[in-house]
Amino acid sequence: MSLCGARANAKMMAAYNGGTSAAAAGHHHHHHHHLPHLPPPHLHHHHHPQHHLHPGSAAAVHPVQQHTSSAAAAAAAAAAAAAMLNPGQQQPYFPSPAPGQAPGPAAAAPAQVQAAAAATVKAHHHQHSHHPQQQLDIEPDRPIGYGAFGVVWSVTDPRDGKRVALKKMPNVFQNLVSCKRVFRELKMLCFFKHDNVLSALDILQPPHIDYFEEIYVVTELMQSDLHKIIVSPQPLSSDHVKVFLYQILRGLKYLHSAGILHRDIKPGNLLVNSNCVLKICDFGLARVEELDESRHMTQEVVTQYYRAPEILMGSRHYSNAIDIWSVGCIFAELLGRRILFQAQSPIQQLDLITDLLGTPSLEAMRTACEGAKAHILRGPHKQPSLPVLYTLSSQATHEAVHLLCRMLVFDPSKRISAKDALAHPYLDEGRLRYHTCMCKCCFSTSTGRVYTSDFEPITNPKFDDTFEKNLSSVRQVKEIIHQFILEQQKGNRVPLCINPQSAAFKSFISSTVAQPSEMPPSPLVWE
C-alpha cells in the first residue's frame, strides 16, 4: 500500500477506534474494463455509478404525452422507450443522463408505440383514484438475469432518466405457499436499508385487484455479479478479494442482525457495479431465523456447492451459520478462481468437505440424521488437510487462510459469525478501501475525509414475520399485498406502470423463470 494509503489507514483506524477524522481526497480516473477497477484507497470517488456516461451510446428517453397540471409539470412527463445497447458492445456500463441534465434528444419512437403508451397512461387514470395526478409508463429494455424466483430486466426510469433494474415476480398467486414466499421477499426488499443489500427503490402500480397477477419491483441496476467476475480471465488482485469479502460480510452482518437467514449465498447472488460496490440479492429463499429447535426447517435450500455440512447431513434445524459456510466457499473461490467443493451429488459434496476438514466428531454431527452419521462412520477415518488451502493461490496468506479456516468449520456452533469475521485483521485493508473511496456513509470535505461513527451498522428492530401467521387464503394474501404495494408508493414521486402494448413488454411478460437446473437441488433423502 502506498504511503498515502498508509497515512489514510492510520487516520481511518483512529476513526474506527472512536472519533471522526480525515484523509486526503483527490480525483478518480474512470476505467472501462470488464472487471471493475478499485479506486486507490487515498482517493475519493466523486461520482455515483449511475452517472457514468459511456461514450458513443445514447440513452433514448421518449416523451410521450405532456400533461398540463402543475403536479405533472413538476414530474418528468415521459414514457421510456428501450435504450437498447448494441449487441456487440462489451462494456457492462449503462448510460444515463449526467446529474442535473435532462435526457438528450431521443431517436423518434414509432408512432404506434407512442400512441399505445399514451393510451396506457390515460387508461390508468380511472383505475387509480388515489393518484389522480398522472402515471408514467416504464418500458423494458433487455433481460439481465434470471433468479430462482423471477426475471430481471434493465429499464430506464422515465421520471429521471436513470437506468434501473426491474424484477418480475411471476406466478405469485398460484397457491398459498408461493403467495407467502413472494410477500415475504417483497416485505424484505422494502425493509432493507443497507448499501451492501439490494432493496426496492419502487414497486410498479398494480392494476385493479381482479387483474393483479404479477409484481414488478424496481431496484438499483448493477453491472455484474461475482460469478461473472470469478470466471472472467482478468486477474483479481488481493485488494479486490479483500474489498469484496468485506462487503459480503458487512451485508451479511446486517441481514443476520435483522434475524434473517439468506439461505442461497452464492457468487451469482452477489451483484457488483462498475466501481466494485457489492450488494447481496435474491431473497426468494430467505427466512427469519427459527429460535425453537424443535421446529423443522426446509432442507431445499442453498445451491449444492455452497451448502453447509449440517444441511447436507439432513439436520432439521439450522442457524445463520449456513450463510457463513457459503461465504467461506466463496472466499476460497475468489482466491483459487475455481469452486472449492465441486461435487456431482450431495453425498460426494459431503465427502469432499470431510476430505478437507477430516472426519467430524460425533459432537459436531449431533444435529445430523442417523443415515448421514452412518455414512460418515462407515467410511475411512480422515485426517484434516487444511494446509492445502495455501495452494489456492499466492494470495492465500497466513491471515487469509486463518480467516477461511474459521468459516469452514464443520460444527455450525463453532463457526465464526459475520460480526467476528469483520474484526479479523485480514479485512482491515478492505474496510479502509471501502470507507475511503467507495461507501456512501462517509464523505469528503475540503479538509479531508469524514468517517461514519459505525462502519458496519446493524438494524433495529429485527425484521418481523409474524404477519405470515394469519395468512390463510390466496385471495386474502392478494388483497393484503395489493394494499401493501399501494402504501409503499412514495407520495412525492409519480407512480410508474408498465406499458403493456410495447413489444419489449410482451417479451418481458413471456420471459420464463430459471430452468430447473438453476434451482437449488432437492435435498438428499438419507436411508
Swiss-Prot record:
Where are the annotated segments for Required for homodimerization and kinase activation and localization to the nucleus? Answer: 428-527
Give residue numbers for the modification (Phosphoserine).
S522
Which GO cellular component terms are attached?
A: cytoplasm; nucleus
Domain (Protein kinase) spans 138-427
Q: Which reaction does it catalyse?
A: L-seryl-[protein] + ATP = O-phospho-L-seryl-[protein] + ADP + H(+); L-threonyl-[protein] + ATP = O-phospho-L-threonyl-[protein] + ADP + H(+)
Task: Please report the PTM annotation for this entry.
Answer: Phosphorylated on Thr-298. Intermolecular autophosphorylation on Thr-298 activates the enzyme.
Which cofactors is this protein said to need? Mg(2+)
In this UniProt entry, the residues modified to Phosphothreonine are T298
Q: Which residues bind ATP?
A: I144, G145, Y146, G147, A148, F149, G150, V151, V152, K167
Q: How is its activity regulated?
A: Activated by the non-canonical Wnt signaling pathway, in which WNT5A leads to activation of MAP3K7/TAK1 and HIPK2, which subsequently phosphorylates and activates this protein. Activated by dimerization and subsequent intermolecular autophosphorylation on Thr-298. Other cytokines such as IL6 may also activate this regulatory circuit.
Renumbered residue ranges of the record's region Sufficient for interaction with DAPK3: 1-125, 124-416
Report the active site residues.
D264
Q: Where is this region: Disordered?
A: 22-72, 90-140
Q: Which InterPro entries match?
A: Kinase-like_dom_sf, MAP_kinase, MAP_kinase_CS, Prot_kinase_dom, Protein_kinase_ATP_BS, Ser/Thr_kinase_AS
Q: Provide the GO MF annotations for this entry.
A: ATP binding; DNA-binding transcription factor binding; magnesium ion binding; MAP kinase activity; protein serine kinase activity; protein serine/threonine kinase activity; SH2 domain binding; ubiquitin protein ligase binding
Q: Which UniProt keywords apply?
A: ATP-binding, Cytoplasm, Kinase, Magnesium, Metal-binding, Nucleotide-binding, Nucleus, Phosphoprotein, Serine/threonine-protein kinase, Transcription, Transcription regulation, Transferase, Wnt signaling pathway
Region annotation (Required for interaction with TAB2) maps to: 1-304, 434-527
GO BP terms: namely: cellular response to osmotic stress; intracellular signal transduction; negative regulation of TORC1 signaling; negative regulation of Wnt signaling pathway; positive regulation of receptor signaling pathway via STAT; protein stabilization; regulation of DNA-templated transcription; transforming growth factor beta receptor signaling pathway
Q: How does this chain assemble?
A: Homodimer. Homodimerization is required for intermolecular autophosphorylation, kinase activation and nuclear localization. May interact with components of cullin-RING-based SCF (SKP1-CUL1-F-box protein) E3 ubiquitin-protein ligase complexes. Interacts with LEF1, MEF2A, MYBL1 and MYBL2. Interacts with the upstream activating kinases HIPK2 and MAP3K7/TAK1. Interaction with MAP3K7/TAK1 seems to be indirect, and may be mediated by other proteins such as STAT3, TAB1 and TAB2.
Q: Which PANTHER family match?
A: MITOGEN-ACTIVATED PROTEIN KINASE (PTHR24055)
Functional summary from the UniProt entry = Serine/threonine-protein kinase that regulates a number of transcription factors with key roles in cell fate determination. Positive effector of the non-canonical Wnt signaling pathway, acting downstream of WNT5A, MAP3K7/TAK1 and HIPK2. Negative regulator of the canonical Wnt/beta-catenin signaling pathway. Binds to and phosphorylates TCF7L2/TCF4 and LEF1, promoting the dissociation of the TCF7L2/LEF1/beta-catenin complex from DNA, as well as the ubiquitination and subsequent proteolysis of LEF1.
Q: What is this protein called?
A: Serine/threonine-protein kinase NLK
Q: Whose protein is this, by species?
A: Canis lupus familiaris (Dog)
